[in-house]
Amino acid sequence: MNNPFLQPYHTLHDTTPFQQIRIEDYEPAVREGMRLEDEEIQQITGNPEEPTFQNTILALEHAGKTLDRVTTVLFNLLSAETCDALEEIAEKLTPALSEHTNNISLNEQLFARVKAVYDKRESLQLTPEERRLLEKSYDGFVRNGANLSEEDKATFRKLSMELSSLTLKFSQNHLKETNGYELVLHTEDELAGLPESAIEAAAHTAHEKGKEGCWVITLQAPSYVPFMKYSDKRELRKTLYMAYNTQCCHDNEFNNLKIVEQLVNLRMELAQLLGFKNYAEYVLKKRMAEHSENVYKLLNDLLEAYTPTARQEVEEIRALARELEGEDFELMPWDFSYYAEKLKNRKFSLDEEALRPYFELSRVKAGVFGLATRLYGITFKENKEIPVYHPDVQAYEVFDRDGSFLAVLYTDFHPREGKRSGAWMTSYKEQWIGDNGCNSRPHVSVTMNFTKPTKDKPALLTFSEVNTFLHEFGHALHGMFANTRFQSMSGTNVYWDFVELPSQIMENFAIEKEFLNTFACHYQTGEPIPQELIQRIVDAFNFNVAYACLRQLSFGFLDMAWYTRQSKFEGDVKAYEKEAWQRTQLLPQLEDTCMSVQFGHIMSGGYSAGYYSYKWAEVLDADAFSVFKETGIFNQDTARSFRENILSKGGTEHPMTLYKRFRGQEPTIEALLKRNGIK
């Protein structure tokens, strides 16, 4: 079978040979991968010898490598470079993959062997890493229904398969709604207030869509965000805002209202089947937070700390709007970004657009890579021999301080059809250390949706896009520095409420003058970014910080409201949502809008009962970065400690243990309040 997935890659560093993969290779490779893993599992269960760590736990850890190889590419490309044919394959294979996973996690003979090893764990003289793998394997089975009766196991399978199909449907509906919307502008008058970069991008989109002489605004962030921030046309802002915030609740085939209800109820049923009172308790048992009480404590503590300042922020924006528009002007959600931007300019004379010329993408990239070199001694070398999945993508070899090969890094910066919105880091190959001691190094990718270059201008980033770059690059470092024996605990395979610490700590550098001075130069003149402009960035950093915090808290409360339910939901999704986040809302709520139906993070992503983890990690990152502030932001000893104690360790120990080893104490919210100027 001449299928690239089913033979050695013969590429540099064993990288994915994207150019050899054809659409028709996926299905046979997935089916063969499932067959091979079934065989590997049968070898474990059919082993006549007494179960040991070696012949059961380790053998299970190594099973399924072929399947993992093909599904990794399939599901990564579904996000980064999809097409109808790929979506059809995913839709076709998802139920089979779900059933395959369930067959393993509900395999009684396999569980009996795992349990036999688990029950004698005290006498096995395992290393801490081996012990954690054993506990993780055992828990994985129990959490997937291995201790259930036959009847309940059948129910568990049914629920899992339904969830699997519905989450895929939820995502596809949202992607299609996003891609299906266009706001076509026909006159220059309709462009009033928009910066040149947004006008150029809209003209470029119109050209791509065959609408010459027009401008097209879409619901993708690089188009939507500047329009809401700068457009002088209130009615058009309202139109776009309503289009964005009513996605997936129209009377069409992409409506997700019913799917939200089904997803929430299925997850509750699944958790209760396993003996948990609700889905949040099931999730949080494997989180740093541990219980919903701790999550609510965090959300409520922050709500109490930030609300007074957030009210002042909104009042200040409302006052400016009334000064400009008249005393009876009512500030609506589609006005907020627009007047907030005006106030920001008035207070700090900081126009995001005026910053763009200093943040040309290739220089930002050099700055971010340079930061990693300065902190950790690693270097990046582009290598065009490494295959990529789209011409936009660049591939780099990353070398450690001693010159040894560390990782492959792919960068994919710009939006295109077939690529979902947002920004993310992913792996095409994770790190592990083989039984022969060979350290198999990772291949990681950072994917963004930055404003594209135009025919006259290179890609110029906003300051928030610079932040996004640093954030995703922090995840990439977590993946690249991975140094663990077992793939399932490597890199970003950590508790969800810990995974954002390595990414968010990097964002702190964005407002450090010493860092900005290393790369921020005007793309035409080469003039370094003026110091007073940097000072204004620093001053503006906390602008509207409390309002932004309440917005994140609103998503956290919404998430917890859906997943702490102990009875079936049969109500009105929109009304329930508005009730859930009522205490966080400082602007009029609109009847027709709905977040839940497009809230991929908590409905189809990995953040169900986990959205609080962004704030949790913010508390951690502020607390951790205070060490860098004390020792000097480029201090290599601090960086080495962060790498050794946190970035390289993956999920090999409880995150609080790792954190305290780096920090010397448990985190508090004080550093975050101080950073945000709340205290």
Each model region followed by its residue ranges:
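Short, hydrophobic/amphipathic alpha-helical patches that form generic packing surfaces
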Residues: 65-76, 139, 242, 336-344, ...
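C-terminal, non-catalytic "cap/extension" segments appended to globular domains
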Residues: 1-28, 32, 193, 214, ...
